[in-house]
Amino acid sequence: MKKTILASAAAMCCAVIAQAQTSQQNGASQTITVTAQKRLEDVRQVPLSVTAISGDALQDAHISNFADLASSVPNLSFSAASGAGAGLSTLQIRGISSQAGSATVAVYLDDVSLTTRNLYSQGTAEPRFFDVERVEVLRGPQGTLYGASALGGTLKFISKQPNLRSSEGCALAEVSSTSRGGVNYNLQGVINVPLSQDTLALRVGVQSGKDSGTIDRVDVKTLKVTEHDINDAKWDVLKLGLKAQFNKQWSLTPALFYQRYRSGDIDAAYEAVGDYQSASVGAKLAPFQTSKIVREPGKDVLAVPSATLEGDLGFADLTGVLSGYHRKFDRVQDGTSINSVYIGSVVTDPVLGAKVGFLPSAVQLKNKVNQSAFELRLASKGYEVGKSPLTWIAGVYAARTKTEVFDNEPVFGINAAFKAAGKNIDDPDQLADAFPGAFKNDSSYYSARHYNDRQTSVFGEITYHISNNLRAIVGLRSLRATQHFMREGDFYYAGGPSSVVIDSSASASTPRFALSWDMDKQTSLYLNVAKGFRLGSANRPVPLTTLVKADLKDMGLPQTIPEAYLPDSLWSYEIGSKSRLLGGQLALNVAAFYIDWSNIQQDVVLPNAGFDFETNVGKARSVGFEFDARLRVTDQVTLLGSGSVANATFSSDMPALGSDGNGALNVRKGDRIQGVPRFNASLGIEVGVGNNGFVRASGQWVGASVGSFVRDSSDHVRPGYFTASVAAGMSLAKWEFTAFVKNLSNNQQVIQRPDVQGVSTVYHLRPRTVGATVSTTF
């Protein structure tokens, strides 16, 4: 069952401080280049709202995951499905939030798309922020250049490339300690070696680390701690890049990104013993404790090979990218509350039913994604005064993706329990809805889902330079997609063996129109209008069991599950400015937007049955603005600030999302979209000390948001919160030493209370972390 869990709270807002350090080192007039429009250009020339954070800034700010990034980028938020943890998260930009259907934010590792559908069993792939040149966050729909699922925007990881001219390297060691947890560490090293001067170079990077857990597991009967820090996480990363420069015009760069991430459990605690667990039902637990019956570990492995061919044709630059994206994500959930408890409640013998209700049950999920893609694009040379007023980019894209989800849910010991009681587990008079073979090998449910997707598209943009300081852009992408879906199911909750095959297809066009005006050398204004689009898909079949029917009735929904859900789309209207004022001492970027979203893909959760399905529910709009500013007060003092507002609301009643016990709709016109903080603000300062030292401090406030659309849910309103961090350090020759504190006040506030697999859980801010970093370059 998919649950929406806002998890952006896990991070500190140091990133802007680290950017200040970079600016101080490089000078106030530093030019920031980005590839937002698939060509390298000055960010001021891009008529989009873009945040670019350098690799050095990411390292200085200890940004290593989506949660950390969300804390420092205006109008970027972060949620998770089925519990908080790596591989479960999804991103939202400008209030375009949906845990159903395809992702609303496209994620790219260089030119390789890591974007896949949202599933109850997994979230977006999350590469570590390691050996990157920069990270770019492109706000607003990017469908013209980045295709379907760039509905709210795009996140790009830009890797550092092999250096053909000189050997270089770097190393870093970080150790820290987390309150209520233990020791954390991160070790990494990168080396670049020219194998042949100016023609062939190899770049290798490795990283290994651990974050300590903070949650203790207690015995459900004695309430004594049996395991400490169960939610620890470990990771290993390997990056390889080989660049061959054949001549001045042509080069080939094969690359590989490999990551293995293992977690001992999700970051969920309980406030009280669940009502299914023991005679201690309702007993209060201490903060950061859980009484779960079954541990919930996970293992997420990513492999991203690619080969990029670049050629200078004289009149234009050719880029061809052949890539793969392979992911295997295995995880376990505690299914006792939705499997054992329900089965026990429909056993006619109350003594046996009570025993069955306490049997441990696991939801064993295995996810596989295998994608191959190819993109070929041709980009004209940059604009030069006195030459052609037109610049352009055109390309083709093709991808084939196979996604498989295997779900096995055993109730351990159920056959033995019936046998010991002298009962027949296949008899519907002794167990409601039973049939022969319903619990083979103790499994209560099995499902195998296979999605085979194919997508082709052509795209292009033309920029007409009306004058030296006025530009107009027109772009269009035309997309065609097909899907073959097959699902196999069996055992008790599936109603016996079943098989479903659904074929579907879709097409879309996503235009873009933009106007950019350089008022003077310091300020540029822009207008951008763009369309975003998401593909639809088949729903996983949901058996109409007694519990499913009861949930549908209680929610005021029809007694049927839709076979599929349709595409959705939006139009975005944005105006903004980018300024360098006070002689370059003040950098100020401001943008305002209005988004109209229709036919929204949304998730409908059946709370007691343990199933969910996707459907299209209506319309929404998101209105807001964002800004970021950097002021270099003196050579030694820099101030930074950023903020955003996103008023994302449904613009019509949503009967498809059900009603409460009194018949009132769960979601009505004007209700806020889930998982979107209305306000977000950060403020930071960096002070240089002498020639080699620095002190940084930053703070962030995240506003309240809506968790569950069910009004009487404990997670309906998620409170706002404030966090702060500090760091100090110094440089000696090629060495840098830093001490830091994240969550300075040790704020352990409960920021959400979602229901996960039928259990009410709580999520805390990660406690204070104190650490030190040593790094060097050579």
Spell out what each predicted region is.
Residues V112-R139, G189:
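Short acidic/polar hinge/loop motifs at secondary-structure boundaries
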Residues K243-N247, L378-K381, T391-A399, R449-I595, ...:
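Structural signature of Gram-negative outer-membrane beta-barrels, strongest in the C-terminal barrel
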Residues L639, Q700-V710, G729-F778:
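C-terminal beta-signal and adjacent terminal beta-strands/loops
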Residues F66-L69, T90-R94, T104, Y108-D110, ...:
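N-terminal periplasmic accessory domains that precede
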Residues Q188, S306-L313, D317-G335, D518, ...:
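Membrane-embedded beta-barrel scaffold of Gram-negative outer-membrane proteins
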Residues E168-C170, S179-I266, N370, F374, ...:
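Transmembrane beta-barrel wall of Gram-negative outer-membrane proteins
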Residues A379-K381, W392-G395, N468, A587, ...:
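Gram-negative outer-membrane beta-barrel transporters
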Residues T35, A67, S71-V112, E133:
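Extracytoplasmic beta-strand/coil segments of soluble accessory domains associated
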